[in-house]
A protein has these predicted regions:
Chain A
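Acidic/polar loop patches that form or flank catalytic/metal-binding clefts of enzymes
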Residues: 228-234, 268-276, 343, 368-371, ...
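A cross-kingdom feature strongest in bacterial/archaeal respiratory oxidoreductases
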Residues: 33, 358, 398-404, 410-439, ...
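N-terminal export/assembly segments and adjacent metallocofactor-ligating motifs
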Residues: 2-19, 24-27, 35, 39, ...
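A generic structural motif
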Residues: 366-379, 430-437, 531-549, 600-611, ...
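Short alpha-helices
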Residues: 435, 442-472, 518, 525, ...
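Phosphate/pyrophosphate-binding active-site segments
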Residues: 456-511
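Glycine-rich phosphate/diphosphate-binding loops that line cofactor/substrate pockets in enzymes
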Residues: 327-341, 393-399, 492-505, 566-575
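A glycine-rich, hydrophobic/aromatic-adjacent loop/helix-cap motif
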Residues: 499-571
Length: 857, 133
């Protein structure tokens, strides 16, 4: 894109990148061309006609190709006789554009007047009123008065639910098709369509349930009128009444930048509550998008069943206590526990919380710092060959290759999926390596299937094929070559794609993998990158789809999943356990029993979870919206989030709690603010050098330039003023890096016997996670607990669609409904986690599925 | 000397025979000008539904931020206004209100007007509010 062309914008010569859309190019040089249907993230269609301009080209002599000069020595310009749409033009050398002439002004005025003939102008009751592109452009360019008779306006449905989450107002729609194009072109959920024609042209949803997309909320942002609004924010407040705070999503490792819009609410007892969640532009993380889980899953912050005071176990029951009483008790118990102290840190603890917790435990000479859930590992490999600084899916196109292993990205990290899919549209080669079909398969020819348990062998096979006879001079390669001898041939075309890629990113999930198996898979993925030389450069490296929003931060702060397993396995040897923001008893079948064995348990929690119920002291922690802190996302970008609402009850931030306990134990004074804790992290954790709060809050110009004065360009979005965060550099980026490969040691694959299946627990986006399920709005999207079977297996087991079946795996038995799906491979049963049937193991294992009645008989 | 006394009382005597300018408030109340801006009123349609749609434009226009509006969705079971939206909460803080009447101007449905009532110091109500609980 370094090549530029010169165009003349209002008789001023400007340079614009070759191939850029004319609207974007003008925007880049400070000239706003009004648009409704054009959106910088989508292909232009030229439907709304709002972007009219005068367009001309320099005349060229047909024989010589030379520019024809006029008498004054300037090139002669041949202007189009009529106005042209700017959005359908791509800048080219010698293009002349006029945006301020009378004809252009007139054209825009007429288009606005025409659009308004079918618009109800009910701005006072419209949720978009105040931040509405149509409103703004009418004020700027409109006629001020309509010649159209009010009674002749078309009247259509005003409150039409496209799904439970999105309402459509058919009168307000101006048929720009941004929403339809978004779901068709970008998220590939073709669930919206136009219906009828002429003035009755209207949008319908063709799916059941309605508007079945995980990104439906984004259409309300890009809608240039109030036609699409969310049920969540329906009449929540007028936009100008809202306060906003920069935040980070806590639902998955992508770390989408959010803006929390808050306002006081009498129904909430006069408290300030979160009214809506909006994406905050960060082109390196989430661009301008967020998924519906992030957008609607904020209600847990204001849930009525939040713990509001410390609880202390007295006579077998948890009773309310004061902070001083509870902290004194905790400090006393930690003191008497001596070294036998362990900590489990949950997925949404901030870096400051984790650091304070580590200091507390280490201050007592405890050594076990576990990160929950212990399903994935390989933090050391990320620190070695993780995606390099400056990696951005937006920059990946032709020549780049993205390998996705053992992950259903759309369910686990929707915005990764979104960006990978769009990169594939741009020409990046996608290799999907999975045991089953996922939605990502649609965008690639390279679908590599493995039998569950053969993940590592499959990657080894790909590496062997990709390398061919090449023998890179890398430490440990000879041993690896010997180990690769036996690797199976997998998919020559996919291996070719990997070998021929200029950039390579490997995204590793943990579907169906035990922690040990995941560690081996991470090593195999790292080998693939190192052996093909794709480390230490932007757009190259390893990316793990961690189970939690701040799992990466926990790994950076010295917490490990191995310690978490150790703590659960040897709970009895711990006299005191600190479980911070984690719920092992609800997620791991072994944990509930194991925790009973442990000595004193102190839990910090938002709700009285099964783990909190086992604790001796429960301390109310603040949610992410009530305090400041930093999270580190999957790409190792450290990002700040800010306080948006007041604390609930007497809750305190985790870092505060641990510091106060530490102070009571004589570990030194408690630090006053999270910024000070961060300063200590900056000092002690080398990766975080230079990442103090002001640095993390720095912003830089981004393209497309959404927000600010021109809501019509990118949609309803505001400028990111909260910071872009900083990504830390991995070892492979350092000059001293010694490339190294190691032989991955995969545990044996599960071998089902006769009548047995491999039961694979899978993660769903919409589940009954404690925090997410507090949002009533999404309940209908969360399925009943089920197990998905292949038609052949279902027939063999005489299981029909919808039948109640008992699934047995690894010592756990659950009763769920059966689903028969062609996408499930033979011999495999997919069992979604977290659907309210109690804790399930995370790793695939041999199990059985049987009709429930048959078991009882 | 009498002459001096009369001269001294001239003004007093003049006022004795003049009609008094004071009125016996609260027994007697002087009418206000038709466009007097007193206490606000929120109006209803003839069928009893509220004219207010909770659009909060009055609050936006208010120069002293005296108005607080929260909107909610009407349902068929619980209907306050004809359209979809109504004001769940409507509060005017009279300690702040400067009776400028901008709210009236901003209202798209003529739901809020300023009436003639100016007796806003309600001793009993105030006392109750202050001392209850």
């Amino acid at each position: 894109m370094s090549e530029t062309v010169t165009i003349y914008l209002d008789d001023r010569a400007i340079e614009a990148p070759k191939g850029m859309n004319l609207v974007d190019a003008c925007k880049l040089h400070g000239v706003d061309i009004p648009v409704f249907c054009y959106h910088p993230k989508m292909e232009p269609v030229g439907m709304c006609r709002m972007c009219l301009i005068e367009l001309g080209f320099e005349q060229r002599d047909r024989t010589t190709g030379e520019v024809v000069l006029g008498e004054d020595g300037k090139p002669l310009v041949r202007w189009f006789p009529t106005l042209q749409t700017a959005c359908t033009q791509v800048v080219s050398e010698g293009m002349h554009v006029r945006t301020t002439t009378e004809a252009v002004r007139r054209g825009r005025k007429d288009i606005i007047e025409f659009i308004l003939t079918s618009h109800p102008l009910d701005c006072p009751v419209c949720d978009k009123g105040g931040e509405c592109p149509l409103q703004e452009l009418t004020m700027d360019f409109g006629p001020g008065k309509s010649r159209f008779l009010y009674d002749e306006k078309i009247h259509l449905a005003k409150r039409y639910p496209l799904g439970e989450q999105i309402y459509l107002d058919r009168e307000r729609c101006i048929q720009c098709a941004r929403c339809i194009r978004y779901v068709e072109e970008i998220t590939d959920d073709p669930v919206l369509q136009f219906y009828e024609r002429g003035r009755r042209l209207q949008i319908i949803s063709t799916s059941e349930p309605g508007f079945d997309s995980k990104f439906s909320g984004n259409t309300t942002d890009i809608c240039p009128v109030g036609a699409l609004t969310t049920a969540d924010f329906r009449f929540g407040a007028r936009p100008w009444e809202l306060d906003s705070a920069a935040s980070i999503c806590t639902h998955c490792p992508v770390g989408c930048n959010l803006t929390l819009n808050t306002r006081l609410d009498r129904d909430a007892g006069g408290r300030v509550i979160i009214k809506r969640v909006m994406p905050r532009q960060n082109e390196q993380v989430n661009e301008i998008w967020i998924c519906d889980k992030g957008r609607f899953g904020h209600h847990f912050t204001a849930a009525p069943d939040r713990i509001t005071t410390p609880l202390v176990r007295k006579g077998g029951k948890l009773v309310e206590a004061t902070w001083s009483e509870a902290l004194e008790l905790v400090a006393g118990m930690l003191k008497s526990a001596g070294k036998a102290v362990g900590a489990l840190a949950g997925p949404t603890l901030s870096n400051e919380d984790l650091w304070a917790l580590r200091r507390l435990v280490e201050g007592q000479r405890g050594a076990r710092l576990g990160v929950w859930p212990p399903t994935m590992t390989g933090g050391d490999l990320i620190a070695e060959v993780g995606v390099a600084q400056g990696t951005n899916f937006t920059d990946m196109g032709k020549g780049a290759c993205i390998v996705v292993v053992a992950s259903d990205l759309e369910e686990e990290a929707p915005i990764y999926w979104h960006r990978v899919k769009v990169a594939a549209d741009r020409g990046a080669t996608l290799v999907v390596v999975n045991g089953r079909a996922t939605k990502l398969d649609r965008y690639t020819r390279h679908r590599v299937r493995y039998h569950y348990g053969d993940e590592v062998a499959t990657l080894n096979g790909l590496l062997r094929q990709a390398l061919g006879d090449a023998a890179p001079d890398i430490d440990g390669f000879d041993q690896l070559r010997a180990a690769l001898e036996n690797a199976p041939a997998v998919d020559a075309a996919a291996a070719q794609a990997i070998a021929g890629a200029t950039d390579l990113v490997v995204i590793v999930g943990g579907e169906g993998l035990s922690m040990a198996a995941h560690g081996a898979l991470m090593q195999a993925a790292a080998n693939l990158l190192v052996a093909t030389g794709h480390v230490g450069r932007p757009n190259n490296g390893l990316l793990a789809v961690w189970p939690g929003a701040n799992t990466q931060g926990a790994l950076d702060m010295g917490f490990t999943p191995e310690d978490a397993t150790h703590i659960i396995d040897n709970a009895a040897s711990f006299e005191a356990l600190i479980i911070a923001g984690a719920d092992p008893a609800d997620e791991d079948p072994r944990a509930a029993a194991a925790l009973q064995e442990a000595g004193f348990i102190v839990a910090t929690a938002l709700f009285l979870t099964p783990t909190a119920e086992l604790a001796d002291v429960v301390l109310p922690r603040m949610s992410f919206a009530e305090r400041d802190g930093t999270f580190t996302n999957g790409e190792r970008r450290v990002q700040r989030f800010c306080k948006a609402i007041d604390r609930v009850g007497e809750s305190r931030a985790d870092w505060q709690i641990f510091q106060q306990v530490g102070a009571a134990l004589g570990q030194g004074r408690a630090m006053p603010t999270p910024g000070v804790v961060m300063a200590q992290i900056v000092e002690r954790v080398p990766w975080y050098a230079g990442m103090d709060y002001p640095t993390l809050a720095e912003v830089a110009p981004q393209f497309p330039m959404v927000g600010g004065e021109d809501l019509y360009y990118g949609g309803t979005m505001y400028k990111n003023a909260g910071g872009l965060g900083r990504q830390w550099a991995v070892a492979a980026e350092q000059a001293s890096y010694q490339a190294r490969v190691r032989v991955p040691k995969a545990p044996a694959a599960p071998k089902p016997g006769k009548g047995e299946l491999i039961v694979v627990p899978v993660r769903l986006l919409y589940d009954q996670g404690t925090e997410f399920y507090k949002t009533q709005l999404v309940h209908r999207r969360v399925p009943q607990a089920y197990v998905a079977l292949n038609a052949g297996d279902a027939a063999r087991l005489s299981v029909r669609e919808g039948a109640r079946v008992r699934v047995r795996l690894a010592g756990t038995e659950v009763e769920v409904a059966a689903r028969v799906r062609a996408s499930v491979p033979e011999g495999v049963a997919l069992l979604p986690l977290n659907l309210g049937v109690g804790p399930l193991p995370h790793a695939a294992s041999v199990g059985t599925v049987a009709v429930a009645e048959a078991v009882g008989a | 000397m009498i002459g001096d006394m009369v001269r001294g009382l001239v003004t007093t005597i003049k006022h004795v025979i003049q009609r008094p300018v004071t009125i016996e408030y609260p027994e007697v109340r002087r009418p206000v000008q038709p466009r007097f801006k007193g206490r606000h009123w929120l109006h209803r349609y003839e069928n009893g539904l509220e004219k207010c749609i909770g659009c909060s434009l009055c609050a936006a226009a208010c120069p002293v931020e005296a108005i607080w509006v929260e909107a909610e969705v009407n349902t068929d079971d619980e209907r306050y206004s004809p359209g979809e939206r109504y004001a769940k909460t409507y509060e005017i803080n009279y300690l702040r209100c400067i009776f400028c009447g901008y709210c009236e101007d901003a209202c798209p449905t003529e739901a809020i007007t300023m009436g003639h009532m100016y007796e806003l110091s309600l001793y009993v109500a105030r006392r109750r509010d202050l001392h209850q609980g």
